[in-house]
Amino acid sequence: MAEKPAAKPKAAAAKAEAKDQSDSYAIVEASGQQFWLQPNRYYDLDRLQAAVDDTVTLENVLLIKDGKNDTTVGQPYVKGASVELKVMDHRRGPKIIVYKMRPKKKTRRKNGHRQELTRVMVQSISIDGKALS
């Protein structure tokens, strides 16, 4: 039987580095909700008062985990931690239908709305000025 060639060390190191970056995340508080943010991914938040292509910094970081199994939990916030976001687009969410009906009566009310959202891309997660990603 032929033996399989050994994996290249450069490829293994690059794969491990990519895994480290994908394992880093931050949990932040924005617009009254908590969001799990990872670098180089986009998320839809409630409408932010920022123009497209602006950079927004979130300081209310509740938890940071880097790819090296180091987790920092804030009480309530992590000191010196921030998440930098880039505003990609302002959009509207899907239509939500609210239907209220009273049984055995002729009372029916149908309302609906679309939530105003801002799509942001996570640029970097940093703690004490040092970027994790």
Swiss-Prot record:
It comes from the Bacteria. Pfam families: Ribosomal_L21p. GO terms for biological process: translation. Residues 1-22 are annotated as: Disordered. Keywords: Ribonucleoprotein, Ribosomal protein, RNA-binding, rRNA-binding. One of its GO terms (molecular function) is structural constituent of ribosome. GO terms for cellular component: cytoplasm; ribonucleoprotein complex; ribosome. The keyword Ribosomal protein applies. Belongs to the bacterial ribosomal protein bL21 family. This protein binds to 23S rRNA in the presence of protein L20. Part of the 50S ribosomal subunit. Contacts protein L20. This is Large ribosomal subunit protein bL21. It comes from Prochlorococcus marinus (strain MIT 9303). The lineage of its organism: Bacteria, Bacillati, Cyanobacteriota, Cyanophyceae, Synechococcales.
